[in-house]
């Protein structure tokens, strides 16, 4: 299985994926966390940024111009089975990733955070779901309903849900910086 980090240009917080948390770009932090699990044959950043470059990160360009569904459909064709991860989850930790991936039994799988929100960018997609997702995308570009109806859903408890905190505003970024565990990066 691969891990695919989805990155598109943010309207609310432009350049957020390269903003630093614990002295490193948010995107590098997520990438490193996924690599650290040892669960993935490859970690890939799937980016709509035309000129994104980060040392140590494998970056593939997302050629789609539509919604998240379009990017996921394209990713299924390119990567097959993968854990989809949002590029704005700087608090993601390897324990949560490992526990989630170990729940995977071949059925598409998505996390539901402690507030009841389905996380389409903390989910496992595979070719089994491609046809249904493609057909659904012809009628609706809303991925939440599709995931709710077609995926095996795993409830993430409140403590673990904190690692799924996403950054969309400067206030979110400051909050993430405040609660991030920077002890592992102190020597950098």
Question: Model regions: which residues?
Answer:
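Conserved alpha/beta core of the MobA/IspD/sugar-nucleotide pyrophosphorylase nucleotidyltransferase superfamily
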Residues: 139-188
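Conserved donor-nucleotide/metal-binding helix-loop-beta segment in metal-dependent transferases, i.e.
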Residues: 93-117
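A short, N-terminal amphipathic alpha-helix
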Residues: 26-40
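Active-site acidic Asp-centered loop
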Residues: 47, 85-87, 168
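N-terminal nucleotide-binding beta1-loop-alpha1 segment
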Residues: 1-14
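Short, polar loop motifs at secondary-structure junctions
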Residues: 45-52
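Short phosphate-binding loop-to-helix
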Residues: 53-85, 91-99
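Conserved nucleotide-sugar donor-binding
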Residues: 118-132, 170
